[in-house]
Amino acid sequence: MTHDKTCPCGSPKIYQDCCQILHLGLDSGAQLATSPEQLMRSRYCAFVLKNFDYIIKTHHAAYLDGLTLEQLQQGPHPEWLGLDVLSANDTTQPDGSKFGTVTFKAWYKMSGEIDAIYERSEFIFEQGRWFYTKGHQMHAKLPGRNDPCVCHSGKKFKQCCMKG
């Protein structure tokens, strides 16, 4: 990743000042995501960069359902186009436990077709950090020809990613 590019998570910051801090700080505990949204954005960025170790380590072990690092590495891997966070929240229960949700669309291209993962992800705060637990999939509708492009280029969809 070049130093002059904004972070894939959609932040205006460069990767080194954004998600890389979380990617590198996870094992040491030096820098952890402070909210479900920040964790979700850093996980999206990890998918873009194929940092599958981060994906596994931020996925709650009780919810992995047999998912392994090797499976993630196998592919095929899409070309990630952009991320739209639609809503995010976290709540603290009376017993002190914390839960959160993030609803997002992660746009990608695979085999020449554009699609999105449209999901309401669930998160839990345990052992001093946030973990992804599971997601509820929804159907994503492609933007109209004259709508802004999913890659956030500022161009119309028909003049950008829709072209091919």
UniProtKB/Swiss-Prot annotation:
Protein name: UPF0225 protein Shewana3_2159
Gene3D superfamilies (alphabetical): 3.10.450.50
Annotated source species: Shewanella sp. (strain ANA-3)
Family classification: Belongs to the UPF0225 family.
